[in-house]
């Protein structure tokens, strides 16, 4: 009988909290040569969720890659969360995912049952998304890791980016925040299992359903809120769109338990990186609780979509989303460029 392995004990970082900080990443990519191609509509120079390559007048290829170390101990659940997180980038571009390849790192003494369970979890969520996993690559490493390289398709004039927000747009978020803080708390055994079951369910929810609804409306920009936190991804959207985002802090959904855990200091390292990256571009119109501010910088794993939609369509889109995703909320609005990229109201 194989020994049960606690996956999170094998990893220093968990989920999207392992992501290299946005500021560090920008420095690493500075000076790296890029090849221009008139068919490459979105490349890594845009800091977007995926690349977009025009195949013909009706079809563009959308590609992304995402993998990370375990955020939960259950191997099948880890596979599900990692797959949902990877596929999400395709949805954030308004595209339809179709094909994927496994990316996997395993320790030399990792039980076969655990490895197979991770793969089963990935296949399960890929199937729900309508994605075919056609193969992959596995190597030995000191820590287990899993994710997917995903390809999808979209009309070359209908894809979304994180740099298309316009003044007057309304911002909608489809999942509550606090995942990084709560998973950090769970690793330290500070949080009730019932609370974590709710968080694990959220991380396994595909953004497919939000994507299928939002493409019916006049959406100008979209990104998924993951490793850089709400303010990090908001900062990228504001910078890329040359606008200022006003976040209404009282309207931002988050798990209440994350507030008390943040007060106890259960802050993942990624939150500090995100704060260092984005804080200079953030202005606080009113005093904000430090724990709530930590939640706004908290790295999310398999987070929701942040959608910039025209004011005329915002109410109808929100109602449509809430029929399937009750936690979707309007969290802010877009204005012309001001001194700061983000205003917290």
Regions found by a protein language model. Name each.
Residues 149-158, 194-214, 288-290:
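Active-site glycine-rich loop that binds ribose-phosphate moieties when present
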Residues 75-101, 117-128, 206-217, 225-237:
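Small-aliphatic-rich amphipathic alpha-helix that forms the alpha element of a beta-alpha
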């Amino acid at each position: 009988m194989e020994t049960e392995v606690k996956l999170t004990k094998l990893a220093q970082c968990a989920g999207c909290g392992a992501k290299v900080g946005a500021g560090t990443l920008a420095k690493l990519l500075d000076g790296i040569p890029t090849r221009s191609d008139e068919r490459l509509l979105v490349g890594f120079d845009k800091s977007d969720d995926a690349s977009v390559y025009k195949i013909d007048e009706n079809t563009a290829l959308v590609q992304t890659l995402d993998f990370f170390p375990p955020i939960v101990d259950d191997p099948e659940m880890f596979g599900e969360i990692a797959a949902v997180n990877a596929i999400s980038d395709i949805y954030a571009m308004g595209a339809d995912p179709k094909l994927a390849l496994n990316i996997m790192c395993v320790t030399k003494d990792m039980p076969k049952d655990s490895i197979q369970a991770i793969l089963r979890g990935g296949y399960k969520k890929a199937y729900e998304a309508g994605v075919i996993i056609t193969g992959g690559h596995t190597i030995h490493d000191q820590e287990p890791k899993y994710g997917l390289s995903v390809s999808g398709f979209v009309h070359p004039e209908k894809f979304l980016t994180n740099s298309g927000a316009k003044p007057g747009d309304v911002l909608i978020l489809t999942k509550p925040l606090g995942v990084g803080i709560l998973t950090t708390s769970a690793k330290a055994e500070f949080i009730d299992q019932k609370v974590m079951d709710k968080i694990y369910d959220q991380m396994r929810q595909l953004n497919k359903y939000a994507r299928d609804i939002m493409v019916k409306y006049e959406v100008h920009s979209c990104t998924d809120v993951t490793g850089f936190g709400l303010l990090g991804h908001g900062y990228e959207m504001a910078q890329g769109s040359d606008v200022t985002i006003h976040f209404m802090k009282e309207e931002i959904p988050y798990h209440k338990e994350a507030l008390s855990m943040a007060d106890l200091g259960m802050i993942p390292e990624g939150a500090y990186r995100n704060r260092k990256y984005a804080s200079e571009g953030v202005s606080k119109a009113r005093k904000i609780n430090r724990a709530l501010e930590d939640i706004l910088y908290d790295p999310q794993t398999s987070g929701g979509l942040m959608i910039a939609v025209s004011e005329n369509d915002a109410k109808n889109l929100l109602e449509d989303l809430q029929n399937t995703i009750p936690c979707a909320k309007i969290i802010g609005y877009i204005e012309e460029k001001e001194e700061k990229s983000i205003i917290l109201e």
